A protein has these predicted regions:
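Phosphopantetheine-dependent thiolation modules in NRPS/PKS and related acyl-activating systems
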Residues: 1-34, 38-43, 48-76
C-alpha cells in the first residue's frame, strides 16, 4: 500500500472530519475529533489492512499519518 492509500484509510477512521482535510503531514492530534477511540480504530485498521500489530507507544511516537505509515512499513 502506498502512502496516499494509507492516508485515505486513516482519514476514514474519523466520522465527523472531512477526509480531504487529512493529508500525509496533518498533525492528527490537533484535529478536534481525535480521541483514544479513533486511535483504537486506526490500530484495528492497520491490523486488518497490513497485518501489523501497532502498540500504543507506536501511536504516541507518530504525529502525522506519514510518520505512522513509516512505523508500519518498518514492522512489515
Amino acid at each position: 500500500m502506498e502512502l496516499n492509500e494509507f492516508v485515505e484509510k486513516f482519514a476514514e477512521q474519523f466520522d465527523d472530519t472531512d477526509p480531504s482535510e487529512i493529508k500525509a503531514d496533518t498533525r492528527f492530534r490537533d484535529l478536534d475529533e481525535w480521541s483514544s477511540l479513533v486511535g483504537l480504530s486506526v490500530i484495528a485498521m492497520v491490523d486488518e489492512e497490513f497485518d501489523v500489530l501497532l502498540k500504543g507507544e507506536d501511536m504516541r511516537q507518530a504525529n502525522t499519518p506519514e510518520e505512522l505509515y513509516n512505523i508500519i512499513k518498518s514492522k512489515m
